[in-house]
């Protein structure tokens, strides 16, 4: 652990951190179900479509605690990807495109892909 910290500090101080930085991207969805049974096939399949692209759930079905504004539409889902390209490739993939109509039939949704802030890539000794 100390070695990794020293190496990360060295890269940061020497200006090499930007070369090691990765910029994640996030798929964010607001979903309001109109048919709870109809969304089940989508829910059962969606993870297998984004795992090959390095995606992982950060939030799945969270009920938002709205503090200001109009609030979210239904439940929230956030999937993190290693890059914007990975997120876009997943969204455009045949596997995901095949199940999107299931979500459309089961309710109302708004979806976004946004780029996050750069993160320092893990350093392995």
List each language-model region with its residue ranges.
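A short, charged, amphipathic alpha-helix used as a generic interaction element across diverse proteins
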Residues: 91-94
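Residue-level detector of intrinsically disordered, flexible termini
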Residues: 7, 16-20, 105
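Short S/T/G/P-rich N-terminal loop/turn motif that feeds into the first structured element of a domain
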Residues: 13-76, 81-89, 115-125
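Short arginine-rich
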Residues: 97-113
């Amino acid at each position: 652990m100390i070695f990794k910290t020293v190496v990360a500090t060295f890269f940061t101080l020497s200006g090499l951190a930007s070369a090691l930085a990765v910029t994640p991207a996030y798929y964010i969805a607001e979903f309001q179900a109109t048919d709870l049974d109809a969304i089940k096939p989508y829910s059962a399949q969606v993870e297998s479509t984004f795992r090959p692209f390095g995606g992982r759930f950060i939030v799945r079905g969270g009920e938002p605690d709205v503090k200001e504004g109009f609030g979210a539409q239904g439940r929230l889902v956030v999937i993190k990807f290693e890059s914007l390209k990975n997120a876009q490739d997943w969204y455009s993939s045949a596997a995901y495109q095949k199940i999107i109509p299931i979500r459309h039939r089961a309710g109302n949704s708004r979806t976004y892909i946004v780029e996050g802030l750069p993160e320092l890539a893990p350093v392995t000794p």
